[in-house]
C-alpha cells in the first residue's frame, strides 16, 4: 500500500464529518426473516444508532427480502441501514450505505454508484495507514478490530487499544471499534476514542436484546460526561 503524504491528510481533514456514534448493531446470519426483524426492532428500541445487515449464507432472494424488510424497519426509527459488501443491493432496497472489506469494491467505485449522500464504511483491521488512505479516498468512517476474540468471525486480526488513540490523532472521520465487544469491555474502547462500537453476538445473543442495547447506549451517555475525551471538538 502506498504511503499517504501529510498534505493529503491535511486536505482530507477538511471534508465534512458525518455523525456516526453509539451502538452499531450488526445483524446475525439467520434465514428467519420475521425473527431477524423482531430482533433488530429490539436493538433499535434499545438505542442502536446504526444497523448493518450482514449475511454470508443466504440465497439471493432471501438476502433481498431481508434487506428490504430491515430498510423499512430502520426508516421507521430514522436510523441508517448499511449493507455489508453488496452495493447493488443497497441501491435496490434504498439502504443508507454500505460497509466494505479488503476484498470488496474500491471506495471510488462504490461512491460512483451510490453518490455522495450515502455512507461508505471501510474495514481497516489493525492498519492505521489503510484508515488514513480510506479517509482520503472518501470513506465516511473506518472500522478497526478485532480488539477482542470474536465469536462471529474467527479469521480476524488483533488490534490494540493504542490504535484507537493513534487514530484520533491522525484521522477525523468517525472510528468504529469491532471484534468481541460486549457491555463489559466496550467502555475501554469508547474512552480510547471509538466513536461507535459494532456488536453482533453480545447484542443479538442476549436474553433481552432491548436491555442489552440500552446498556451499550448508556456507556456513551456516561462517556459524554468527560468532554476532554470527545473527538467532536476536533
UniProtKB/Swiss-Prot annotation:
Any one cellular-component term (Gene Ontology):
cytoplasm
List the keywords (alphabetical): Magnesium, Metal-binding, Thiamine biosynthesis, Transferase
Q: How is the cofactor bound?
A: Binds 1 Mg(2+) ion per subunit.
Catalytic reaction list: 2-[(2R,5Z)-2-carboxy-4-methylthiazol-5(2H)-ylidene]ethyl phosphate + 4-amino-2-methyl-5-(diphosphooxymethyl)pyrimidine + 2 H(+) = thiamine phosphate + CO2 + diphosphate; 2-(2-carboxy-4-methylthiazol-5-yl)ethyl phosphate + 4-amino-2-methyl-5-(diphosphooxymethyl)pyrimidine + 2 H(+) = thiamine phosphate + CO2 + diphosphate; 4-methyl-5-(2-phosphooxyethyl)-thiazole + 4-amino-2-methyl-5-(diphosphooxymethyl)pyrimidine + H(+) = thiamine phosphate + diphosphate
Which Gene3D superfamilies does the entry mention? Answer: Aldolase class I (3.20.20.70)
Instruction: Kindly list the positions annotated as binding 2-[(2R,5Z)-2-carboxy-4-methylthiazol-5(2H)-ylidene]ethyl phosphate.
Output: 150-152, 180
Q: Name one GO biological process term.
A: thiamine biosynthetic process
Cofactor names from the entry are: Mg(2+)
Question: Any idea of its EC number?
Answer: 2.5.1.3
Where Mg(2+) binds, per the record, is at: 85, 104
Q: In which pathway does it act?
A: Cofactor biosynthesis; thiamine diphosphate biosynthesis; thiamine phosphate from 4-amino-2-methyl-5-diphosphomethylpyrimidine and 4-methyl-5-(2-phosphoethyl)-thiazole: step 1/1
**Entry superkingdom:** Bacteria
Binding locations of 4-amino-2-methyl-5-(diphosphooxymethyl)pyrimidine = 52-56, 84, 123, 153
- Pfam family of the protein (one): TMP-TENI
Q: Which cysteines are joined by disulfide bonds?
A: none
What GO molecular-function term can you cite, just one?
magnesium ion binding
Q: Per the similarity annotation, which family is this?
A: Belongs to the thiamine-phosphate synthase family.
What does it do?
Answer: Condenses 4-methyl-5-(beta-hydroxyethyl)thiazole monophosphate (THZ-P) and 2-methyl-4-amino-5-hydroxymethyl pyrimidine pyrophosphate (HMP-PP) to form thiamine monophosphate (TMP).
| Protein name as it appears in the record | Thiamine-phosphate synthase
Amino acid at each position: 500500500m502506498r504511503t499517504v503524504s501529510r498534505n493529503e491528510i491535511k486536505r482530507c481533514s477538511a471534508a465534512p464529518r458525518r455523525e456516526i456514534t453509539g451502538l452499531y448493531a450488526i445483524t446475525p446470519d439467520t434465514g428467519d426473516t420475521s425473527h431477524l426483524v423482531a430482533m433488530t426492532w429490539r436493538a433499535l428500541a434499545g438505542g442502536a444508532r446504526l444497523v448493518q445487515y450482514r449475511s454470508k449464507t443466504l440465497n439471493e432472494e432471501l438476502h433481498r427480502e431481508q434487506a428490504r424488510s430491515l430498510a423499512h424497519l430502520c426508516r421507521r426509527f430514522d436510523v441508517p441501514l448499511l449493507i455489508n459488501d453488496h452495493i447493488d443491493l443497497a441501491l435496490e432496497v434504498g439502504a443508507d450505505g454500505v460497509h466494505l472489506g479488503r476484498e470488496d469494491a474500491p471506495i471510488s467505485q462504490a461512491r460512483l454508484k451510490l453518490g455522495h449522500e450515502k455512507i461508505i464504511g471501510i474495514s481497516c483491521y489493525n492498519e492505521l495507514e489503510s484508515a488514513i488512505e480510506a479517509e482520503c479516498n472518501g470513506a465516511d468512517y473506518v472500522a478497526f478490530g478485532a480488539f477482542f476474540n470474536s465469536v462471529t468471525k474467527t479469521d480476524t486480526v488483533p488490534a490494540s487499544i493504542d490504535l484507537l488513540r493513534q487514530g484520533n490523532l491522525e484521522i477525523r472521520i468517525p472510528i468504529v471499534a469491532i471484534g468481541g465487544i460486549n457491555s463489559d469491555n466496550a467502555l475501554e474502547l469508547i474512552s480510547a476514542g471509538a466513536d461507535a462500537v459494532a456488536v453482533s453476538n453480545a447484542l443479538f445473543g442476549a436474553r433481552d436484546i432491548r436491555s442489552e442495547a440500552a446498556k451499550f447506549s448508556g456507556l456513551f451517555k456516561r462517556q459524554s460526561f468527560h468532554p476532554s475525551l470527545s473527538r467532536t471538538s476536533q
